[in-house]
Amino acid sequence: MIRFAEKKDIPYIKELWDIAFGEEPDFNKYFFDNFFKYEDTLLYVEEKPVAMLQMMPYTLKGIGAVTYIYGATTHPDYRKKGLMGKLLKKSFEIDKSRGVKGSVLIPANQGLFNYYSKFGYETLSYVDTKVMKSTNELKYTVEKAKIEDLKSMAEIY
């Protein structure tokens, strides 16, 4: 069954989140404290939630309202059963009913580009990393973003 999250689902949602994204526990706590919403969290439930995705509302300049698919994951015991595909298709139906123009996502690794293309996603841009060597001529300090920087970064992007 596919449905939106309820309060009783939180332990299972956090378990799924930690399995998939456990390498950054500080960020996970930050996400749940600041961004998590039941009405944005779509679940696939088999006695308990076993797959999920966040349907975060977002506005793209020149396009308008879109859904940012975030935190898409399936419990390892339930993978390769098409559950994420069902969640994505349901999210498309919900978007259409809400008048949302589309959805975007950022695949976590190269292998996921092919997976998501099966559902109509296309690559719109690439992010490249450039290493800069520090010199005395720099007027600004460049440093790795921290959790506390996320809110101000979200305002820029």
How would you label these PLM feature ranges?
Residues 1-54, 64, 68, 127, ...:
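Short amphipathic alpha-helix that is part of the acyltransferase structural core
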Residues 58, 72, 108-110:
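An acidic- and aromatic-residue-enriched active-site/binding cleft used to recognize and process polar
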Residues 58-69, 79:
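A conserved beta-turn-beta hairpin within the catalytic core of GNAT-like acetyltransferases
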Residues 71-74, 80-93, 118:
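Conserved acetyl-CoA-binding loop-helix of GNAT-fold acetyltransferases
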Residues 88, 95-108:
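Conserved GNAT acetyl-CoA-binding A-motif
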Residues 109-111, 127-129:
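Short, flexible active-site-adjacent loop segments at beta-strand->alpha-helix junctions, enriched
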Residues 112, 116:
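Basic (Lys/Arg-enriched) interaction patch that binds polyanionic ligands
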Residues 117-126:
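Conserved acetyl-CoA-binding loop of GNAT-fold acetyltransferases
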